[in-house]
Amino acid sequence: MSSVKRSLNQEIISQFHYSAAEGDIAKLTAILSHSPSLLNETSENGWSALICDRSIVNKSRQTALDIAKFWGYKHIANLLANAKGGKKPWFLTNEVEECENYFSKTLLDRKSEKRNNSDWLLAKESHPATVYILFSDLNPLVTLGGNKESFQQPEVRLCQLNYTDIKDYLAQPEKITLIFLGVELEMKKEFFNYAGEISKEEEDGLVAWFALGIDTVAAEEFKQRHENCYFLHPPMPALLQLKEKEAGVVAQARSVLAWHSRYKFCPTCGNATKIEEGGYKRVCLKEDCPSLHGVHNTSYPRVDPVVIMQVIHPDGTKCLLGRQKRFPPGMFTCLAGFIEPGETIEDAVRREVEEESGVKVGHVQYVSCQPWPMPSSLMIGCLAVAVSTEIKVDKNEIEDARWFTREQVVDVLTKGKQQAFFVPPSRAIAHQLIKHWIGMNPNL
């Protein structure tokens, strides 16, 4: 008898939920007039008539959104698809430890307060201890370090030049781009005497670094005189060969040099501009230009924010990875895209994932970021939890997208290219996001 009563009760709950999904107000009112407690009754999936956890999946691995789409409940599907945030899934950690990605570490203190001190900058330009790094077409000058007789892979190191090496270029300011990068983090208590060139009163113990951009003709002439040096090219993946702290310096220099190469003329009026503030500002030469009054972002180096996200299946056991046509065969990575004006990080993640893969995203959690000097992006790394699972790739955006199991991803990270697919190298934030997801499992 009790089982019959239970079945009848379940049938009433089922009818009530069906009416709620249909939006049948009249029937809902009639049912509630007899059994108001049904408002709090939940189905086998844990859903009530008023709310549902979008991250819960049934035995067929379907979410509430998947089911609404399957049965054609467009109004419900629209509500579920466009609801933001939601309850944090159980498989996401409460705290995310701060980490430094490649291109994030540096040897330098930027000393931005010195950029307006033209006398100090001029003195540092000719200081014997000052370090210059040379660029041509945004490619840094490097050399191979280590013992030539060693069987180990030689290190790619920046060529650290001094004033004597580059003074001829400084004499032709119209042909170069000079950027003050900062000073070494460790102050030098005492410099060598340098034959008495610098008085003790003038010495501050700060070792300044500058980036110097020269044209291709000058670059070829320099290489002929310094056969052990070469310009690192192409930027990807060549820049990933640098030591971590030197890579951070290159990221800073390359991004600012790229900005100068693209903004030689005033974005406000179109007239020519000149470089000021140690290379961190371009000033219009037209006296009545509006950009000369107040602070304008067009006068300073720009950074383009990009979201890059590890999309996790609603049940936490799979991740979504995609690939573009230009990728090496077999490489899959996290989805990514530029943030649009007036858009939050979370909304950008949801929009980009849906545009590229057709998958809807609910909860978004920030993990870490990475400067990406191609030419000047900031990759904002996030975890994103899907609320739908069906993939519909936009071929105009990406070539393919797939769900990969945790086991597949672990095999790729541990066995590399022996597998059917591979992911970006460890110095890319995509790799670190994938590892972060894998690391959520305490058994790994």
Swiss-Prot record:
Enzyme class: hydrolase
Protein residues bound to substrate: 300, 336-338, 352, 356, 397
Cofactor requirement: Mg(2+); Zn(2+)
Binding site for Mg(2+) 2: 352
Binding site for Mg(2+) 1: 336, 356, 397
Binding, Zn(2+): 266, 269, 284, 289
Residues noted as binding Mg(2+) 3 in the record, renumbered to the chain: 352, 356, 397
SUPFAM superfamilies assigned to the protein according to its UniProt record, in alphabetical order: Ankyrin repeat, Nudix
Name assigned to this protein: NAD-capped RNA hydrolase NUDT12
Organism: Bos taurus
Lineage: Eukaryota, Metazoa, Chordata, Craniata, Vertebrata
